[in-house]
A protein has these predicted regions:
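Short acidic, glycine/proline-enriched loop segments that cap or flank alpha-helices
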Residues: 87-94, 112-119, 137
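Short acidic, hydrophobic short linear motifs in intrinsically disordered regions
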Residues: 14-23, 89-108
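Eukaryotic partner-binding/assembly regions in large regulatory complexes
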Residues: 1-59
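Short amphipathic alpha-helical interaction segments
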Residues: 28-36, 113-130
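Short alpha-helical segments that sit at the start of domains
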Residues: 60-95
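A short, conserved structural fragment
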Residues: 41-49, 125, 129-141
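Accessory beta->alpha helical hairpin/"wing" motif in late/C-terminal subdomains of nucleic-acid enzymes
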Residues: 55-60, 135-162
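Short, amphipathic alpha-helical interaction segments positioned at domain boundaries
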Residues: 148-190
């Protein structure tokens, strides 16, 4: 499962009730840590344990890496911003969002300047679920605007505060450049 999910959390949230439950895969990693580490070393991977976040994750040359599309990256940035704001404002019990709130953050920050397709939302939600950033109470295809989406702290591992601010600025500059291009008259180049 570590190869399919990229990390294993100590607590997983029940997709229906969104209540925390112990993850048996985490306990297996704790019990057999040295064997798993030796096995993964042969494959060119390293299993890293983060005791503060209570996760095991793969890293190294043998670990699968995935390039996210720009749209997925922007959605991850928005979810990271929501997570930060909820933790700072309401504490750990408030780490639930929904598509409506993500869209609102996107409009307010200028990161989502167009309506995203259902396929773009599905891709982003699927990848965030695969990488243990979120938990959905239903299949990705069944998620509606008000469906609760539980946010895991692992989103902090994928997007640091510095990375988040840098990417937001970069995407805003790109959006501004595109807006200027659209407003230029057709004969401006002549």
């Amino acid at each position: 499962r570590l190869f399919r999910q990229t990390c294993i959390l100590q607590l997983r949230y029940d997709p229906v009730t969104l209540t925390p439950r112990d993850n048996p895969d985490y306990e297996i990693c704790v019990r057999h840590r040295h064997f798993i580490e030796n096995y993964l070393a042969v494959l060119g991977c390293e299993m890293e344990h983060d005791p503060q976040e209570h996760i095991f994750r793969l890293k190294g040359e043998g670990a699968e890496t995935e390039k996210f599309s720009q749209t997925t990256t922007m959605i991850i940035l928005l979810v990271r911003m929501i997570y930060r704001d909820k933790i700072l404002g309401e504490g750990l019990g408030a780490t639930v969002t929904n598509l409506g709130e993500i869209r609102e953050y996107g409009a307010n920050t200028g990161l989502l300047s167009r309506k995203l397709t259902a396929a773009e939302w599905r891709e982003a939600l699927y990848l965030m679920g695969r990488h243990q950033m979120i938990e959905l109470p239903a299949a990705v295809r069944d998620v509606k605007d008000e469906t609760p989406i539980y946010l895991y702290s692992t989103i902090l591992l994928y997007v640091s505060a510095a990375d988040m601010n840098e990417l937001i600025e970069e995407y805003r500059e790109e959006a501004d450049d595109e807006a200027v291009q659209e407003n230029l008259p057709a004969d401006a180049d002549q």
